[in-house]
């Protein structure tokens, strides 16, 4: 696999609710996180500040557990997911299709859309 697998918001939510250990990574910017966030633990790694965390990614993420990546619409998260696979050797990487916007529509309308 050289690109992340797409996962719909409802599917990801169901897997999390079932207790599956999936690491959630949000690559959006601070101001986006302030506008809308998931109501569960998320590792915040904004792409614009990659230089601050890139050399620590192995300490921040467990490569033995699946990683689901999200952004606003699914593009930046897909790029980060490709990097995890191609450059860091992660094998179980999911990209939240439609990003947090899809989560707002499919799972939790209390999460603001922007």
Q: What residue ranges belong to the model's regions?
A:
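Rhodanese-like catalytic fold shared by cysteine-dependent sulfurtransferases
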Residues: 1-22, 30-66, 75-114
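Short, surface-exposed ligand- or partner-binding patches at beta-edge/loop junctions that are enriched
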Residues: 70
């Amino acid at each position: 696999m050289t690109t992340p697998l797409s996962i719909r918001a409802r599917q990801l939510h169901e897997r999390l609710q079932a207790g599956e250990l999936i690491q959630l990574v949000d690559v959006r910017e601070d101001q986006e996180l302030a506008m809308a966030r998931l109501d569960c633990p998320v590792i915040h790694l904004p792409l614009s500040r990659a230089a601050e965390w890139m050399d620590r990614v192995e300490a921040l993420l467990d490569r033995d557990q699946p990683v689901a990546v999200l952004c606003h619409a699914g593009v930046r998260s897909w790029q980060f997911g490709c990097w995890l696979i191609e450059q860091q050797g992660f094998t179980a990487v999911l990209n939240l299709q439609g990003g947090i916007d899809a989560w707002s529509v499919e799972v939790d309308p209390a999460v603001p859309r922007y």
